[in-house]
Amino acid sequence: MSVPLDDLGEAHGFDVIVDEVSSLDAKAKSVILKSGATLEGFDKIIIAMGHHKVQIKGMKEHTLSICGAPEEAVELHTRLDALIQKGGGKLAFGFGGNPKDRSSVRGGPAFEVMFNVHNYLKKRKLRDKFELTFFAPMQRPGEKMEEKAHVMMDKMLGMTNIDKKIGKKIVSFESDGIIFEDGEKLVSDLTMFISAGKGHNILESSKLPLSEAGYVVTNEYNEVEGFEGIYAIGDSAMLLGENDWKAKQGHVAEVMARNVAHNILNPDDKLSYIDHLNILCVMDIGNGAAFVYRSNTSAKMIPLPIIGHWMKKGWGWYCKNSKLGRIPRLPGL
């Protein structure tokens, strides 16, 4: 699913400038672009630049991600098809961590790709020609989803004959595999890896208050205190809250964006994003899905055979068309 920015701008009445930010001076409310243009004179600036990835030696050269440039996802498909033409191979799927901010881990998409590839190969009657391995540096990957979900995920790995290598720090990536801190090498013909996030590099010189992981520190209204008219949302902002399961997800970013728009227009009736902090996703596995939800008061993982896959595809259609104003948004979404 993709939404052209020009179409989005036309639907909602804002101008689109396609350029790269070279620097941001929050005090001066000045943004310098790679083209040399300067954006200044604005009363409000909302920082929604996403984040950068924690770098590991060889990651750029020897891995592909579905949480990066769109071209990487296309290349992943191309290289998988090449291995199919070759007759088989060893595939590795994993994600990384950031001990400075656990909310920046992207685990769900890695599981989705892995299980979808498993079912793709199974449909083509080639699953026995491939070795699939899941890897991650933490001892209990997926535990944010809560204990029962973690156990269910482990069972799914066993049922689909997917090996795992967990609990060991990733030292480097090579053209033919992954090296771990204990010296062991996981051999791989194709490695899909989603690195954990860290604050965007541009923010380092912005003079804004940053967390240890480099994210902008805001209050619950996404205001940067001490910087009037500056807001940070989504992956650019540090998530507040003491719970260790919180995660940076798209629906939380949307709540932040909606709240900031409301708060700018209604300064005496501000909305907080704190009560909306939860984990919510439909994890597509190719022949079905799993509904995952966790909050301070509830945690569940519900299998959705067959229908779950189509629910996920349907959500993509709804998401695109509702954002373009072609259909109404569902209440609360």
Question: What residue ranges belong to the model's regions?
Answer:
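FAD-site-proximal beta/loop scaffold in flavoenzymes
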Residues: 62-87, 185-190, 194-255
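A cross-taxonomic marker for long C-terminal extensions/tails that follow the last structured domain
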Residues: 45, 148-221
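N-terminal Rossmann-like dinucleotide/flavin-binding domain of flavoprotein oxidoreductases
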Residues: 1-42, 145-163
